[in-house]
């Protein structure tokens, strides 16, 4: 149990299970005059926040629940909920949520009154957040294998743990899902035996609106059956090929709905799930790299004020890249090339062995350094070169299973023609890195739905903007509000989360000035 916290702030007050906070948002607006000089003007705007402190009963529906990530999440939540330990060659392993920011990391809340040293508390102790042990989990999968056997097929969790989990999962089958063969690799057809758009063994893609309505019914039934307050849907299924963004097809919300009703060939399964979620006003998170959120989906989410987040879990190689590239550029060192190679043997790798699906992943992984490069015109400009040579290779190697091997080489330019190479060899258990991200995305998304804000000149509170860029820390290619570029630097992404928590409880944002150490 963590130490209880009382926030004594003149900016916040608790009333009727809600936390009310006042905050002055300070920034600097920059203009460039006719002579090319920057004019910097400090700004300040007053905001009021309202946070619902009651943690609801939350259900999680996973698209792809029978895959490696889905079964690993089920195993993790069950092991933690029932305190299931197991023994391996290194000794007894107790259940935990290592790798989860919300469950296994801490944040600074201030300095000790006596010593002046930093004081840290668990991330999830600042404000009430849902406990992953309490999640009600179900989902869809194109494979009808019962979830205990799907866990065995995944080969992620230790066998001695699996055997203790089987009683909770045996005979539990995924909900029937959608299968549009054109969007995932043909090698996945052998798994597709649990699809509702199949008649007499033939897959039908000529009534996609009926597919939307079926998913909506599944959501409503799940919520009613389990007496849930909220439901969150997360895609952890196969990577799809990119959908073409076409005029009059998926470029606006109205055109998108019309195209679904016409069963247009560029309407992907993930988009069907997203639209169904939005129409039910249920948050939808895309954990794969495909472009589920075509412009029409984003506009639909804005119209219904329904949360969407994506794209693509940022777990291993890309997470390191978003830190290391930022470090090099901030240090005044110029990365010239980044070569990234992966091989893995799970079903994700099998699906990505198809060129169209690999292309989705390649686009997702390449974009992670874009804003970092653009932040430094001293290093990257037309004269000396404004690009980084960046290549991505992913190979399927069945023997290594879920243990993904990632090798990176960063080739950088130093002063006076010098060069530097940093080579990284990273072996990680892919699903054991990705599953904590799912937990964080769900916990953070649910919390964000309980935050309301009243901006300058507004008389009523409103929900946060539906494109949830707050989730960027956990995503390779984070969605950004239209008109804004994504932020990819990992430290910036985490600082945004921590700063928001501080603001909501009336604490000052941690500015790291540390006057008590540097002033006389």
UniProtKB/Swiss-Prot annotation:
UniProt keywords, alphabetically: Cytoplasm, Inositol biosynthesis, Isomerase, Lipid biosynthesis, Lipid metabolism, NAD, Phospholipid biosynthesis, Phospholipid metabolism
Cellular component, GO annotation: cell surface; cytoplasm; hyphal cell wall
EC number(s) per entry: 5.5.1.4
InterPro entries recorded: Myo-inos-1-P_Synthase, Myo-inos-1-P_Synthase_GAPDH, NAD(P)-bd_dom_sf
Substrates-to-products reaction catalysed: D-glucose 6-phosphate = 1D-myo-inositol 3-phosphate
Disruption phenotype: Inositol auxotrophy. Virulence is not affected in a mouse model of disseminated infection. Simultaneous disruption of ITR1 results in lethality.
Highest taxon listed in the record's lineage: Eukaryota
Localization per record: Cytoplasm
GO molecular function: inositol-3-phosphate synthase activity
List of residues binding NAD(+): 66-69, 141, 177-178, 188, 191, 236-239, 287-288, 312, 315, 346-348, 361, 401-402, 430-431
One GO term of the biological process aspect: phospholipid biosynthetic process
Pathways involved: Polyol metabolism; myo-inositol biosynthesis; myo-inositol from D-glucose 6-phosphate: step 1/2
Cofactor: NAD(+)
Major localisation: cytoplasm
Family: Belongs to the myo-inositol 1-phosphate synthase family.
Listed PANTHER family: MYO-INOSITOL-1 PHOSPHATE SYNTHASE
Role of this protein: Key enzyme in myo-inositol biosynthesis pathway that catalyzes the conversion of glucose 6-phosphate to 1-myo-inositol 1-phosphate in a NAD-dependent manner. Rate-limiting enzyme in the synthesis of all inositol-containing compounds.
UniProt subunit comment: Homotetramer.
Protein name as annotated: Inositol-3-phosphate synthase
Organism: Candida albicans (strain SC5314 / ATCC MYA-2876) (Yeast)
